[in-house]
Every structure is written in structure tokens, then in C-alpha cells.
Amino acid sequence: MESAEAQQEGPKHGMHPSFLNTIRQKERVKERLKGIRQKIGVYSAKGGVGKTTVAVNLAYTLARMGYSVGLLDADIDCPNVPMFLGTDAKMDISHFPLKPLDVRGVKVASTAMVVDDAKKPIIWRGALVAKMLGDFFENTDWGELDYLIIDLPPGTSDSPLSIMQLLDLKGFVLVTTPQRIAAVNSIRSGLMAKRLGVAVLGVVENMSAGEPTASTKDVAAATGTEIIGTIMMDKRLGEMADSGRVPALEDDKAYNEFKRIAERIK
């Protein structure tokens, strides 16, 4: 329910109360995150293209390069970052603001770290998910960081929209795969970001066979950016991720692939 103050001030400022509340929340989020130098989203409208793989390895690559890094799992419905890191540790929710967990040198926060059973589905309507995201941003204390890498949910509806509206992002890394259907959805993602005034920093082709495909080149062209990296299809790296090991920490080839991406978005 809108506060009496918001209801009174809405007409005075010529704004709907809900819009006024969004502006106020954005100001509170900005204040909370003021110690973070760069906030970068990893995004695609298509699920299953490897957003979390890219987000996790990019975060740990930046940490390995000597930067202070946070990793935010912003996928409320399917928060997979803790599984990729092989941790079931929980954040302390008895005190606010919440403190991210240090997982191998990177500060990590995820809704999977605040619910009793992360394996149970979260069945919420879009508006409630958007509110949860706003509350999560507003009530998590990251401290001072060089980079916050944000693993976005797929789609172009409430969740990614809320993130684009509430966070002052440097921009997005778009993730796609060689398949045409992934490219079509990645283009949707990039155009949505640009329409909302958020930069597209570059395109990454995951599960690549080597040279970027024509479909991936189409994504870069349609969004006015460049292909900044290709991640090779490698069964061994997939097995590492399944066992909670971060390839960028343990495999020099993987690290160098992600380092090339990191150098392009710094």
C-alpha cells in the first residue's frame, strides 16, 4: 500500500505515487551501492546460453587480476550461482543490512543464500519478484568494490526491467550461442537495454566452435557493439562447473579467455 506521504506528494510533483516511490528507492539503492566503482550486468533474454557461466568466471577472473569484486545472483526464480560455486552457505538474515559471503575471494549474494531450501521453487508474480530485487539491492552492504558483476535473469519483463531502472550500470555483456534462436533473443536483450539507456559493452559467444558465427555477428551489428570474446565448447570445463569448481581459477586457458573479455569491459 502506498504511504500517505507518497499519496500526498504524488499530485504535487505531477507524478503517480508508485513512480515517485521507484525514484526514491533508486536513490536509496544508489546510496547503498556508492562504494562500487563499476556495476556490470551479464544478460540474455534466452535462458540456457551460459549467462551464469560467464558471470561467475568473469567475476573470478577480475579477482584474479587483482580487483575487489562482488557477484550478485539477481535471478530470483532460478538462483544458480551458489551451485556453480559449490557452496550451500547462508547469509545471516538476522541483521540488516545483509552482508555478502566471501567465497574464494569474491563477495557473493544470492536469494538462494537467504531461503531455507534453495531447491524449492519460488512461485511469485512479477511485481513481487521486482519488489524482492529492489529490497535485495537496498539492503545488501557490499562495501568498497572495484566491480560488481550481476547475473541477470533471462527475459525482457519485470526482473531485468527493475534491474535496469534501479541500478546505475556501466552496461551489459550480452551472452549468446552459435544458434540462430539464441541470437534473435540476444538482439531483443540488447535493444531493450539500449531503449532504457543502458550501454551494451559487447557480445560473448558461449559454447563456441572457434570463430564467431554469422548469428553472433548479427547480434553485435544489431546492438551497435562488438564481439568481445568466445568461450570454447569444452566438456572438461562443464564438468568442473558441475562440481562447483571455477574454471577461471583452475584452468589457465579458461582464465585467458575470460581475461580477454575482462580487458574489453574494464
Please provide the spans of the model-predicted regions.
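C-terminal lobe/tail of nucleotide-utilizing enzymes
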Residues: 1-27, 190-266
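Phosphate-binding P-loop
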Residues: 31-37
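Residue-level signature of catalytic and energy-coupling elements of molecular machines
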Residues: 36, 47, 73, 81, ...
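Walker A/P-loop phosphate-binding motif and the immediately C-terminal alpha-helix
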Residues: 38-75, 190, 203
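Phosphate-binding loop that captures ATP/GTP phosphates
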Residues: 68-123, 130, 217
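Conserved nucleotide-binding/hydrolysis micro-motifs of P-loop NTPases
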Residues: 76-78, 114-116, 154-155, 178-182, ...
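Phosphate-binding/switch loop-helix module in NTP-utilizing enzymes
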Residues: 115-166
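Conserved Switch II/interswitch segment of TRAFAC-class P-loop GTPases
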Residues: 143-147, 156, 168-189
